[in-house]
């Protein structure tokens, strides 16, 4: 009662194909892939340390 048989998955696949059509599924998967790629890029950009230049000013020691 709790598990799905092969026929259940086949029926679900047919319904999904009817709802979205053949051309829409690759577009959706492409959009998901682009989102994952940009997320990974954002995560690696955040890991890069901020290298700020520091300038040490020394007072002129004239006596």
From Swiss-Prot:
> Which residue ranges traverse the bilayer?
1-21
Tell me which Gene3D superfamilies the record gives. 1.20.5.3310
Give the domain of life. Bacteria
As for membrane topology, the entry says: Single-pass membrane protein
**Any keyword DNA-binding?**
no
InterPro entries in the cross-refs: TatA/B/E (IPR003369), TatA/E (IPR006312)
Which of UniProt's keywords are assigned here?
Answer: Cell inner membrane, Cell membrane, Membrane, Protein transport, Translocation, Transmembrane, Transmembrane helix, Transport
Quick one: where's region Disordered? 42-63
Which stretches does UniProt call biased (Basic and acidic residues)?
Answer: 53-63
| Pfam families per the UniProt record, alphabetical | TatA_B_E
- Give me the Gene Ontology terms describing cellular component: TAT protein transport complex
Q: Which GO terms describe its biological process?
A: protein transport by the Tat complex
Q: Name one GO molecular function term.
A: protein transmembrane transporter activity
Q: Where in the cell is it found?
A: Cell inner membrane
Does the UniProt entry include the keyword Oxidoreductase? no
Name the major location. Answer: membrane
| Stated role | Part of the twin-arginine translocation (Tat) system that transports large folded proteins containing a characteristic twin-arginine motif in their signal peptide across membranes. TatA could form the protein-conducting channel of the Tat system.
Q: How does it assemble?
A: The Tat system comprises two distinct complexes: a TatABC complex, containing multiple copies of TatA, TatB and TatC subunits, and a separate TatA complex, containing only TatA subunits. Substrates initially bind to the TatABC complex, which probably triggers association of the separate TatA complex to form the active translocon.
Which protein family is it in? Answer: Belongs to the TatA/E family.
- Protein name per Swiss-Prot or TrEMBL: Sec-independent protein translocase protein TatA
Q: According to the entry, what is the taxonomic lineage of the organism?
A: Bacteria, Pseudomonadati, Pseudomonadota, Alphaproteobacteria, Hyphomicrobiales
Gene name of the record: tatA
């Amino acid at each position: 009662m709790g598990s799905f048989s092969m026929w259940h998955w086949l029926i679900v696949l047919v319904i999904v194909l009817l709802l979205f059509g053949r051309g829409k599924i690759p577009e959706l998967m492409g959009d998901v892939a682009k989102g994952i790629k940009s997320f990974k890029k954002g995560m690696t950009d955040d890991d890069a340390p901020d290298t700020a230049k520091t300038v040490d000013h020394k007072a002129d020691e004239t006596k």
